[in-house]
Amino acid sequence: MAGRARSGLLLLLLGLLALQSSCLAFRSPLSVFKRFKETTRSFSNECLGTIGPVTPLDASDFALDIRMPGVTPKESDTYFCMSMRLPVDEEAFVIDFKPRASMDTVHHMLLFGCNMPSSTGSYWFCDEGTCTDKANILYAWARNAPPTRLPKGVGFRVGGETGSKYFVLQVHYGDISAFRDNHKDCSGVSVHLTRVPQPLIAGMYLMMSVDTVIPPGEKVVNADISCQYKMYPMHVFAYRVHTHHLGKVVSGYRVRNGQWTLIGRQNPQLPQAFYPVEHPVDVTFGDILAARCVFTGEGRTEATHIGGTSSDEMCNLYIMYYMEAKYALSFMTCTKNVAPDMFRTIPAEANIPIPVKPDMVMMHGHHKEAENKEKSALMQQPKQGEEEVLEQGDFYSLLSKLLGEREDVHVHKYNPTEKTESGSDLVAEIANVVQKKDLGRSDAREGAEHEEWGNAILVRDRIHRFHQLESTLRPAESRAFSFQQPGEGPWEPEPSGDFHVEEELDWPGVYLLPGQVSGVALDSKNNLVIFHRGDHVWDGNSFDSKFVYQQRGLGPIEEDTILVIDPNNAEILQSSGKNLFYLPHGLSIDTDGNYWVTDVALHQVFKLDPHSKEGPLLILGRSMQPGSDQNHFCQPTDVAVEPSTGAVFVSDGYCNSRIVQFSPSGKFVTQWGEESSGSSPRPGQFSVPHSLALVPHLDQLCVADRENGRIQCFKTDTKEFVREIKHASFGRNVFAISYIPGFLFAVNGKPYFGDQEPVQGFVMNFSSGEIIDVFKPVRKHFDMPHDIVASEDGTVYIGDAHTNTVWKFTLTEKMEHRSVKKAGIEVQEIKEAEAVVEPKVENKPTSSELQKMQEKQKLSTEPGSGVSVVLITTLLVIPVLVLLAIVMFIRWKKSRAFGDHDRKLESSSGRVLGRFRGKGSGGLNLGNFFASRKGYSRKGFDRVSTEGSDQEKDEDDGTESEEEYSAPLPKPAPSS
């Protein structure tokens, strides 16, 4: 009965709360404060049915709904703030955020943690400030931006003696047309908290310029920030950029041993949420953190300074990280530039704007006091408080004094009357921006030589319009560069002597002589699959001027066009594809073993089950009908299928110059690309996109842009252009590409008359783009190498459409690499290249030892190696037998020397071998013998020190956890 009474009382109290607060109005201890002016409320559907802000999840976890208490903005670009006290006094940890907002009504939201809000009202205009003491940004959400998720085991520390006591929510209402019905809005954030201590603590590292001056009319001004990191290791997982209207692009890097690794790069005019880094970046003692903001002073009549008003500018990069709990710091700052000369080598991407869709552009403004100022009016110098260079470690003081606790409180209005320039001017402008060579210079006067950029919003609109590319809100992946032009940068060093690919001269497959070989691929068993044209030939009579196939009367190819070949002896294991194709072209195989092929005569894409005779599983395009809409292709060239999502990408093709994406079921999703024009094609322009290669762990799709002689890579989810790889040695054509972890293989075409570049294969370090090897066949020669495929052991196959030949190439010296494993994901990379940051590997063999092991395995498993397994076994057994004889002789001599003539020689193999294993006290302990030698330990191989990464647990440490995270102690600071 007592329990029922308590339950009834609780329901009654909750009902009263719902009626009184109307919309999650949690009457915290702040309820005694004066309330914001408000009238009788009528609530939107979103506000109905809520019973309170605190929801228990289990004994230790609870959810906190932090929402606006039913507000109706009256003007566009209204910023409302509200606060909520942490419902517990003890220490807690924020482990997840869930936005509760509609894109139709809310432009963006920020959630701060502090000890005292700026206002005592239930909500207030944010121009009054956010907090009176300290403010730390915990979360940011923006329309069209990706969500921010905390990694498992990571949490923000709140409450207790040192954590924040209040949450302050800031909501920006952009376009208020959705409020024509005067409904109430309860947008906000649901915060998941736990009382369970987290092993990793999240924090914020703020990089901020405090002394940048932007001269009026200056075309390009760089604000550079750099600090040496001298703390315990931190691991970056998200970032956020912030400037006002003059900002073009903000980029952040970790610099280690002169190598620039991208943390994040974003357009500050995009919604300023936290964006996840493509791959976690670790920062350790001695690394340098560097950031650059690119501004323009065009349109200003006087110098622009760093400050808190809309007439001022800001250069902020927020880096969200986590650290091991016992070493964790909740905030760090950098406001200096300790290495200005270092920025001479900053990647060129740092000065190149990122295109955005017009509806994604951020609305900016700071402080209502600037709303009535004319944009061309004289700009006041910042106040003394704004100019003060504060202590580097005082993050909250920086926010309070420099930003006035009002960062991101915007009042700039979008001006629809701004006019664009002509299209021809724009084309030249974009081309110059992309092709300009001295983008990496930090000097503002040198940067002024760049092409004019104009208004940031208009430039991005134009780039979108001319490129026809899907814009992205996500940053480029962690890498050391974006793209270079021929002859620039460290692109073509001498090929490394440690890595060389040569033709396997005893492979008989070179004499198969099928028809024109158009495609090659490898199945799950590493069998070679060939797609060829039989007795059909693609020549000048095959198509008319409208790309309609003219030799339909020949009928389909009457022989099997798909051959499965044994990779060792080149025997045909299986064949199919009879009476189905006219002019085969591209071939790829998905993770389920299905074949994806294209036919340029049929203008179609086929999905085939190699073990079924029921016909194609899926057909895309219309037979013999070229076209450029969602249902037609025009001579499609290749297909790539994303392993995790099943997304289908088609390069289309000889006469469409686009990439088309379909769902796994064949439904059109999107397309991007356009025909290139002029001698300097822009990113996203193609002249025969001929071959595709997926880079799954980076979510990239690389395209062999054949007639432009280059390789372009794009994000598979956003279609953002990531990088271009182009070398003078490519010549005018790149026919085909293939990717294996860490490496990109390519083959070019025959040189034009007067050109010197030979037709050959290339091996490139995917991280840096540099060529590390070139190769050619010995038997026969390349004439039109049409497709290439590589296996993860470095075996390469190339098919030639003119010589009707397939070559097999292998590594003459095993590439030295390391195998890095984290959470079941293995990444192989060149030892000298820092491609993707991975945790430190322990109890792994060194790369040289691993190389020897792999070579032994290869010798014992490859029939074509010419080394007999019997011979190897004999060579291994003989030394063992000799050693056994020696030991037995020594034992016999020892027995005689001590007069033990009656002792029988131990003939038991168990006892003899036992002493070999070190189990007998007087025996020969080979384990101790080898353990005493340099480079060995009793625990096995010494750990490979994988620079800049976590440490993984020993295989036999007996713990149940998958990893053992141990942050190493920092090195002592230099005496100087």
From Swiss-Prot:
Function: Bifunctional enzyme that catalyzes amidation of the C-terminus of proteins. Alpha-amidation is present at the C-terminus of many endocrine hormones and neuropeptides and is required for their activity. C-terminal amidation also takes place in response to protein fragmentation triggered by oxidative stress, promoting degradation of amidated protein fragments by the proteasome. Alpha-amidation involves two sequential reactions, both of which are catalyzed by separate catalytic domains of the enzyme.
Annotated phenotype, changing H108A: Impaired Cu(2+)-binding; forms a closed conformer in the presence of citrate with a reduced Cu(2+)-Cu(2+) site separation of 4 Angstroms. Abolished peptidylglycine alpha-hydroxylating monooxygenase activity
Species annotation: Rattus norvegicus
MF-aspect GO terms: calcium ion binding; chromatin binding; copper ion binding; identical protein binding; L-ascorbic acid binding; peptidylamidoglycolate lyase activity; peptidylglycine monooxygenase activity; protein kinase binding
UniProt modified residues of type Phosphothreonine: T946, T959
Segments on the Intragranular face: 36-866
Disulfide bonds, paired cysteine numbers: C47-C186, C81-C126, C114-C131, C227-C334, C293-C315, C634-C655, C702-C713
Name of the protein in question: Peptidylglycine alpha-amidating monooxygenase
Record InterPro entries: 6-blade_b-propeller_TolB-like, Cu2_ascorb_mOase-like_C, Cu2_ascorb_mOase_CS-1, Cu2_ascorb_mOase_CS-2, Cu2_ascorb_mOase_N, Cu2_ascorb_mOase_N_sf, Cu2_monoox_C, NHL_repeat
Binding site for Ca(2+): V520, L587, D787
Effect of substituting D787A: Reduces peptidyl-alpha-hydroxyglycine alpha-amidating lyase activity
Topological type in the membrane: Single-pass membrane protein
Pro-piece positions: 26-35
Gene for this chain: Pam
Start-end of each NHL repeat: 501-544, 570-611, 620-665, 673-717, 769-812
Pfam families in the cross-refs: Cu2_monoox_C, Cu2_monooxygen, NHL
